[in-house]
Amino acid sequence: MTISTLLLSPNRRLLTCLSRVPSPWLLHSSHPAPGPPGALPNCFGHHCTKRVLLSDGFRRTLCVQATLKDHTEGLSDKEQRFVDRLYTGLVKGQRACLAEAITLVESTHTRKRELAQVLLQRVLALQREQELRNQGKPLTFRVGLSGPPGAGKSTFIECFGKMLTEQGHRLSVLAVDPSSCTSGGSLLGDKTRMIELSRDMNAYIRPSPTSGTLGGVTRTTNEAIVLCEGGGYDIILIETVGVGQSEFAVADMVDMFVLLLPPAGGDELQGIKRGIIEMADLVVITKSDGDLIVPARRIQAEYVSALKLLRRRSEVWRPKVIRISARSGEGITEMWDTMREFQHQMLASGELAAKRQTQHKVWMWNLIQENVLEHFKTHPSIREQIPLMERKVLSGALSPGRAADLLLKAFKSRH
């Protein structure tokens, strides 16, 4: 009797007996999932083949395997070896492979982006298997950090990150660095402001230029998060430039959104958009030391009162306001305890898992919008008309809305 026949058998006692058979026998007797040469024991193919006999979810597992096969069929031998090398090195925790993989997903070259999607599909499949073994709960914690310039984000991350690595965590910091709209250049200076943390072998800091994207969050931030998690980093910090739309973009990528604010004078609440405060799961008043302790306490009280008037986004969590000092270390431990409390409550209620699923849909639609716009602009029939339409809009001959309608009609007529 073949394995496929046994899978269709209604005799669950027989399947239970088979589940006790050592994994190597299963791999030899059944059709193993495609996997990289020399893959690790915990690689995707090994677990999926065993899961076929262990649960009723084998149809979904086989579907994922078929998807992986579809992705790899068009690869040359050289490309397959390249993806295999990156994947194997990534799951082994090799920092060089992680850096190379992030560089691959950041590439604008069409073929390299296709290879990046193959790699991401394999990492996501492994991540899904690990979550299934953890009762469907995420194994990592994603935190978005934002705040106005001068709030002390980099100083805080270094102090906070060192505390986490000393506790045995592996930390990845994705620091989105603003690019020049004129030259496209970027300083990428976050590592120079986190000297001690950048030397820590349990921390990985990756500055990423925005390349002029709106809001300061790169197109590939989601992909970089997944790759860092595949590389064994259990805490991911995403630091944004804090210039408006970046906060809304990063909120669709993280489990917890933390807003860092300095103790300043004047109308503080008027300077922060209401929507940004509503998104915050935790408001942190930084630089609460020395002469700034009194202003920090006043700002804390103002935000506590303000948050009471806002609609809660979670049924189990009410946003809190705390004070910290990265210079003295005061409040850093309490802040981490608050963040862990948030994570535990969201996991227990199931809100965190639901949030991750929603974020995957947002991720997909964001990519669709970006790719459709790129395809529209580069379409031969549209590319020739764009300069003409722009001149007519500037001269007042056409309204922007009318020009857009004409371009869209021309685009539809060619399809």
UniProtKB/Swiss-Prot annotation:
The residues that the entry says bind GTP are G147, P148, P149, G150, A151, G152, K153, S154, T155, D289, S325, A326, R327
> Chief localization class?
mitochondrion
At the top of the EC hierarchy, this enzyme's class is: hydrolase
Where does this polypeptide localize?
A: Mitochondrion; Cytoplasm
Q: What is its EC number?
A: 3.6.-.-
Q: Name one GO molecular function term.
A: molecular carrier activity
**Any one biological process term the GO annotation gives:** cobalamin metabolic process
Q: Where is the transit peptide?
A: 1-62
SMART domains attached to this UniProt entry: AAA
Q: Which reaction does it catalyse?
A: GTP + H2O = GDP + phosphate + H(+)
Give UniProt keywords alphabetically.
Chaperone, Cytoplasm, GTP-binding, Hydrolase, Mitochondrion, Nucleotide-binding, Transit peptide
Q: Which GO terms describe its cellular component?
A: cytoplasm; cytosol; mitochondrion
SUPFAM superfamilies found in the cross-reference section: P-loop containing nucleoside triphosphate hydrolases (SSF52540)
- Provide the activity regulation entry from the record: GTPase activity is stimulated by MMUT.
Q: How does it assemble?
A: Homodimer. Interacts with MMUT (the apoenzyme form); the interaction is GTP dependent.
Question: What family does this chain come from, according to its entry?
Answer: Belongs to the SIMIBI class G3E GTPase family. ArgK/MeaB subfamily.
Q: What is the annotated role of this protein in its UniProt record?
A: GTPase, binds and hydrolyzes GTP. Involved in intracellular vitamin B12 metabolism, mediates the transport of cobalamin (Cbl) into mitochondria for the final steps of adenosylcobalamin (AdoCbl) synthesis. Functions as a G-protein chaperone that assists AdoCbl cofactor delivery from MMAB to the methylmalonyl-CoA mutase (MMUT). Plays a dual role as both a protectase and a reactivase for MMUT. Protects MMUT from progressive inactivation by oxidation by decreasing the rate of the formation of the oxidized inactive cofactor hydroxocobalamin (OH2Cbl).
Protein name per the record:
Methylmalonic aciduria type A homolog, mitochondrial
- Gene of this entry: Mmaa
